[in-house]
């Protein structure tokens, strides 16, 4: 019996702090919607657990109560409600109004300030996730595998290892190692963590409590969201202080590249585009460029290389590299269309640059799903100069839309973009342009490489088609997770 058929017998609890479209702040929300659906398509019995934020309660308003969760330690009582995501995957909503019913986002209030009780909010989520994967499950349904995501669920493996009976094996997926869920150590008592766990061989991290470290230390397996990122986080440059622990657990660490929703991101059917197209009708991409230029007030110029960016405006994303490179870029036949929000200093800088050269630079501050799709289709190339990028999704969307990405060689960008070479172009491997150094000069050099190929319309079309031929669907990644679940289950039974 192959691994996928064995996995079809497994019950998997997918614990997450966000899941699109019910609650989303970034890529984790998309992954939490798509991966469980792909696992269910393989025959696994998957259930998603997430907090009952107001948006979740509204979306799951027909959910029915299936269990009461009694207060434990310093954690409040709650209810479990059962509903279904739009994909049809079952969802358990953790309803606790005192912790989750707030007007802000999942992690911060409306002013962008972290909630002061986040340790309790996500401690409860982790504790309930662990119970559902143990003999203490409040439901008849009990998970064979607990799949945790980032720091908000990372305390669950610790609960499983520190006393819950009949604990199932767990894995923690690292979507971004920089977010570590660090709190004062004295909150551990309210979370019900035993004294023996409050040490460096446990949840303690430089005199504080780290949810993420707890997951990395106690989980049976660790997954990073790309093979390259799995290697990078074991180094001082990218380990965010956790590289020593990750090195000791290297034999339990794997990298599995995220996928994308190939239906939602499909230029042939995308309702947001002026003209739909595919690899066979790539000439129909051009009207989308003209429409984007008109919408954003850019000069109508078929010959300019229109660079698109849809990004958070943060240091991690290398936004300063693009700003510093602008004088050189504007000396070339280049236009830029940016959509994003984040650090106020970057927002202001982009507003100023766009106001100074509105024919060449357009900056829309904030996020607009429709415009994001239109930039992917209307841009000639897509820029992602990230200092680090665990996986990244926009470079996959770009290739899907025949928009070659210009990316820094880090993390998932390395694993999903084929660097241009003449041989690679004709072998079908080249799909974009990579640069190594996080400097404005390296970015400009990569844009120059793109301009040279852009001038050769036949080569450029081949490059676009190479990207469009790539399979970024979740099927392959889901299969790798399924095989990992089978291995975890077998190891636990040995």
Swiss-Prot record:
It holds the Pfam family Glycos_transf_1. It comes from the Bacteria. ADP-alpha-D-glucose binds at residue 24. Its EC number is 2.4.1.21. It is an enzyme of class 2 (transferase). The keyword Metal-binding does not apply. It catalyses: [(1->4)-alpha-D-glucosyl](n) + ADP-alpha-D-glucose = [(1->4)-alpha-D-glucosyl](n+1) + ADP + H(+). Pathway: Glycan biosynthesis; glycogen biosynthesis. GO terms for biological process: glycogen biosynthetic process. One of its GO terms (molecular function) is alpha-1,4-glucan glucosyltransferase (UDP-glucose donor) activity. Keywords: Glycogen biosynthesis, Glycosyltransferase, Transferase. Synthesizes alpha-1,4-glucan chains using ADP-glucose. Belongs to the glycosyltransferase 1 family. Bacterial/plant glycogen synthase subfamily. This is Glycogen synthase. It comes from Aromatoleum aromaticum (strain DSM 19018 / LMG 30748 / EbN1). The gene is glgA.
């Amino acid at each position: 019996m192959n691994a996928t058929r064995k996995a079809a017998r497994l019950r998997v609890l997918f614990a997450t702090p966000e899941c699109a479209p019910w609650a989303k702040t970034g890529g984790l929300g998309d992954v939490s919607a798509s991966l469980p659906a792909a696992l269910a398509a393989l025959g696994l019995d998957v259930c998603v657990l997430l907090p009952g934020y107001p948006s979740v309660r509204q979306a799951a308003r027909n959910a029915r109560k299936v269990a009461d969760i009694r207060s434990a330690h310093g954690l409040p009582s709650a209810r479990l409600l059962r509903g279904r995501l739009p994909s049809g995957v079952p969802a358990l909503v953790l309803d606790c109004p005192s912790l989750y019913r707030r007007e802000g986002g999942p992690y911060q209030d409306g002013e962008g300030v972290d909630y002061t009780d986040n340790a309790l909010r996500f401690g409860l989520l982790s504790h309930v996730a662990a119970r559902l994967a143990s003999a203490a499950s409040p439901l008849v349904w009990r998970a064979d595998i607990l799949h945790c995501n980032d720091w908000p669920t990372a305390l669950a493996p610790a609960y499983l290892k520190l006393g819950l009976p009949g604990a199932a094996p767990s894995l923690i997926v690292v979507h971004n190692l920089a977010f570590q869920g660090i709190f004062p150590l004295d909150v551990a008592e309210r979370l019900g963590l035993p004294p023996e766990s409050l040490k460096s061989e446990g949840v303690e991290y430089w005199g504080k409590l780290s949810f993420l470290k707890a997951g990395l230390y106690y989980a049976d397996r660790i997954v990073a969201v790309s093979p390259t990122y799995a290697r990078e986080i074991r180094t001082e440059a990218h380990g965010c202080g956790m590289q020593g622990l990750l090195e000791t657990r290297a034999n339990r660490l794997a990298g599995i590249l995220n996928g994308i929703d190939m239906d939602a991101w499909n230029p042939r059917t995308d309702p947001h585009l002026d003209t739909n197209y595919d690899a066979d009708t790539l000439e129909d991409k051009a009207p989308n460029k003209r429409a984007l230029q008109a919408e954003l007030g850019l000069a109508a110029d078929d010959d300019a290389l229109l660079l698109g960016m849809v990004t958070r405006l943060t240091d991690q994303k290398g936004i300063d590299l693009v700003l510093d490179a602008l004088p050189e870029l504007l000396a070339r036949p280049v236009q830029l269309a940016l959509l994003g929000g984040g650090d106020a200093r970057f927002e202001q800088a982009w507003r100023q640059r766009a106001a100074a050269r509105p024919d060449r630079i357009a900056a829309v501050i904030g996020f607009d799903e429709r415009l994001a799709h239109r930039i992917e289709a209307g841009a000639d190339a897509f820029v992602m100069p990230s200092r680090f990028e665990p996986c990244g999704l926009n470079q996959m969307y770009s290739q899907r839309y025949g928009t070659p990405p210009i990316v820094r060689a880090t993390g998932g960008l390395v694993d999903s973009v084929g660097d241009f070479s003449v041989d690679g172009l004709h072998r079908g491997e080249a799909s974009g342009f990579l640069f190594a150094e996080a400097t404005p000069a390296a970015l400009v050099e990569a844009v120059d490489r793109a301009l040279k190929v852009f001038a050769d319309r036949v080569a450029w079309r081949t490059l676009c088609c190479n990207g469009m031929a790539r399979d970024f669907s979740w099927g392959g990644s889901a299969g790798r997770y399924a095989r990992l679940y089978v291995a975890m289950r077998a190891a636990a039974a040995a």
